[in-house]
Amino acid sequence: FFPVMVSGPILRYREDGEQFFEPHPFDYKQVTQGMQRMLWGFFKELVISERMALIVNTIYGNYEAYPGVYIWLGTVAFAFQLYTNFSGGMDIVLGLAQTFGLKLPENFRRPFFSKNISEYWRRWHISLGVWMKEYVFYPLLRSSFFTRLSKDMRKKLGKKRGKQITTFAGMFLLWFSVGIWHGGDWKYIIGSGLLHWFYIVSGELLEPWYLKCMEKLHINPKARAVDILRIVRTFFLVNIGFVFFRASSVGDAWKMLKSAATVFNPGILIGGQIFELGLDWIEFTIAVVSLLILFGVSLMQRKGDVRERIREKAMPVRWLIWYVLLFYVILLGYYGPGFSTAEFIYQGF
């Protein structure tokens, strides 16, 4: 199917194939909702991602001149650049498919709301995670080598610990493969692969200790404040991986992380320096407002399809919403003469 050939989602014939051979008569609702989703994707890509790219390129292109908080600012900007670029592309693809009456699998479910790394990968590039599990991880665990390894580890370390060690070994190869898939360079193998393996393994090993600490401190691990802290922690850990992903090399990534950890210059956030990173104050304000819109819609999506909720509004209201978004993209999007052609980052992987 032509829209998915460049950047996904990765389809599985047994789940998605039959619909390509079924008749799909014109359906006004499907066409309009598909176009609405495409518009939302263009908003993410042309209004947000392209603006974030200017900040990212300025800081990462000359990181030695932008130490400390600049590094964190550039990395957070890259997180949103990558997310809006990739998920925006998926919105365009899935929306286009919907106009033809086809339902493709979701590839993103608000990943920056994840409370741990495992959950993050169940929300980020979902089809890749499913493919890797089915065609790399499970076949590895069923292989003769891992079967023998599992038996040996269970004899030496006990049933529970032996199974855990075998699973961790399989996960190591899985995440190494994820890094290879992203490009094969060590910055991808570390930033998108092995670092996340380390996070997941560490989280599983430390979970009993974490729960005991929460119990001794009389803290409810399911409290809203705890959930917010876990979301912030997960976003922070993911951003460390993004430093490797975006840096020119592993060496540059280490230098940037060292600078981010040792130079304390939060004054740039309230001074004029922040408007010297590729966006003036007007463009920066547009970027912030657009991110707030994205955040608000993401919160609304947790309660169901936003398009369906808009569809329930009176006709003048729903048309006003979509026309405002359309003109927002037309007037504030980065496209046309004077701008670099918008590209989808994941086309390169």
Which ranges hold each PLM region?
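Membrane-embedded transmembrane alpha-helical bundles that form the catalytic cores
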Residues: 1-297, 301-348
